[in-house]
Amino acid sequence: MKRPLRIAAWTLAVALLALASATAARFWFLHWQPDRERYPLRGIDVSHHQGAIDWRAVAADDVAFVYLKVSEGGDHRDRRFADNWRQARAAGLAVGAYHFFTFCRPGAEQARNFIDAVPVEADALPPAVDLEFGGNCGLRPDAARMRAQLDAFLAPTEATYGKPALLYVTPEFFDAYREALPARALWRRSILHAPDARAPWAVWQYHNRARVAGIVGPVDLNVYAGDAAALERWRGGARAVGAR
């Protein structure tokens, strides 16, 4: 074989190998999940960014629970929440609502925003609070002020729904405020690897670009720390598996 042909052949082989490796890596990324025997219950969290959702298709695609964004700050409401809440419940999913907590509005004001939008349903999942820096305002309160405003949100919210709230925390937020967090079940974000052992968790968000039937585009995936019976008890107000 002439040298130019050999070079071309090797170049093609390397390119094909790189393409195959990239394809395999993408497949692994899109389909990676925790041990299903250990964590059998899979869930999603969504907002208006996922658009119109076919909830029956979601329920048929091995999804057991869902958290829906309902509110943010003191006055923002997710425009798809009411439809998502009604349709996801009708599809037989365990459904909860979450609030994106902002540092720039009083906690009590944010609680009113959440409570005014979320129905009181005995079988709903506990209310959840999204605590993170991404997408938040520029303020970075000290631990005492953050805790005071979070408590101002939690007190009326938990009194209204009769269940301890679930706290969603990113690694960055957890590092900054770990010692100031109240003793509540944690929903920990840890993409493609298990959360560290610093604190137990009830819900683990393990993927942020997954695909689920009934949803156009990527979606977050989660697992619950217990089995179906434990999830049902948690819906009823019992202590979450993995709660601190």
Regions flagged by a language model, labelled:
Residues 6-27:
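Hydrophobic membrane-insertion alpha-helices, especially the h-region
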Residues 1-5:
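N-terminal Lys/Arg-rich, disordered targeting/topogenic segments
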Residues 115-129, 133, 178-201:
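Structural recognition of alpha->loop->beta junctions
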Residues 35-51, 56, 181-244:
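Functionally critical loop-and-helix segments that line ligand-binding/catalytic clefts
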Residues 158-175:
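Aromatic-lined carbohydrate-recognition surfaces of secreted/lumenal glycan-active proteins
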Residues 41-43, 64-65, 94-96, 124-128, ...:
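Structural preference for beta-strand elements that scaffold enzyme active sites
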Residues 20-72:
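Boundary/entry segment of secreted carbohydrate-active catalytic domains
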Residues 36-51, 70-152, 158-160:
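Substrate-binding cleft of extracellular glycoside hydrolase catalytic domains
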